[in-house]
């Protein structure tokens, strides 16, 4: 770590893990969230959908070897792309656009049932961060067949395949084609 005087210095830090992810002390952001447990007896743990994602390399190699749009779609089924959308077209005029990346499998039903307590709904409303009740076994992320644990599978991610046209507009990712809204 760079020091104020320009010299480097070694900084040690202990990271704590739980079955839900890395435990965080958010006291530097808001004093009430500091310490373990917090004022209301909770602990914050952050789950990273890509923490154990080593599938990306396989995904990109398969993209590079693809001979058709079907090959591209088959490659995406690994759910290896960490965070970006996929857009592709073939020589026959068929196009594809999808958000086939590592996305936590938190259905709206799970969010409605498991975002609880005085803080979690506020975090969701203000920061769009889903904070599930880790004390309830019914509040675990879901699993899709053929997908890595706790992630949405290929069949449940937004995507469209079309012959007319497709567009990628990051802030309007759900609108690649007005006839095929995501």
Where are these regions (language model features)?
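Mature extracytoplasmic enzyme cores
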Residues: 1-182
């Amino acid at each position: 770590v760079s020091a104020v005087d320009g010299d480097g210095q070694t900084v040690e830090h202990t990271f704590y893990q739980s079955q839900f992810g890395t435990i965080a002390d958010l006291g530097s952001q808001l004093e009430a969230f500091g310490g373990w447990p917090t004022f209301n007896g909770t602990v914050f743990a952050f789950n990273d959908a890509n923490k154990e994602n080593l599938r990306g390399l396989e995904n990109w190699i398969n993209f590079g070897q693809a001979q058709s749009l079907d090959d591209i779609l088959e490659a995406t089924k690994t759910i290896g792309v960490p965070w970006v959308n996929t857009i592709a077209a073939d020589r026959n005029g068929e196009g594809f656009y999808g958000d086939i990346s590592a996305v936590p499998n938190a259905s709206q039903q799970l969010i409605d049932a498991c975002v609880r307590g005085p803080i979690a709904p506020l975090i969701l409303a203000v920061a769009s961060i889903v904070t599930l009740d880790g004390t309830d076994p019914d509040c675990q992320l879901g699993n899709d067949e053929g997908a890595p644990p706790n992630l949405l599978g290929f069949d449940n991610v937004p995507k469209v395949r079309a012959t007319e046209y497709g567009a990628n507009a990051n802030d309007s990712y759900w609108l690649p084609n007005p006839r095929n809204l995501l």
